[in-house]
Amino acid sequence: MNLNGFNEAHLAVQQGPLAAPVLGRVIGMLAARAGCPIDRLDDALLITDAVAARAGSFSDDGRIGVHVAARTGVIELNVGPLRENGANELIASAKLPGVGNILERVADEIAPERTTAHEYLRIRMAFGTPRPSGSVTMEEPDAP
């Protein structure tokens, strides 16, 4: 955990059969630390699969970096460096027939970002604040 309260991981990913499983496990681990509910974990894994399957096609050499940051209620991925307009191309490539665009449907925010030298895609998912452990989830019966 860093000083800002984030759990972070930096991965270098090359397109191939291990990209999705490795990235998925890292996302799963950090999502658990962030208190991610199971339904949103499934959404995060859909995003992971889309990034692992397609992002390398939009880089100069088939490799990308993925920076994952998680804290209670939020998971954020920064994907890149991508080639010029690669972030928009990556977003467009996530469209599936009959389903629509996976990234747009399940992420709370997707935003191409540019530094002076590179382009990145920021993908953010937010979810409700988890209940503290040991909290009462059912109403207590009235005392007689």
In which residue ranges do the predicted regions lie?
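Bergerat-fold GHKL ATPase/HATPase_c domain
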Residues: 1-46, 133-144
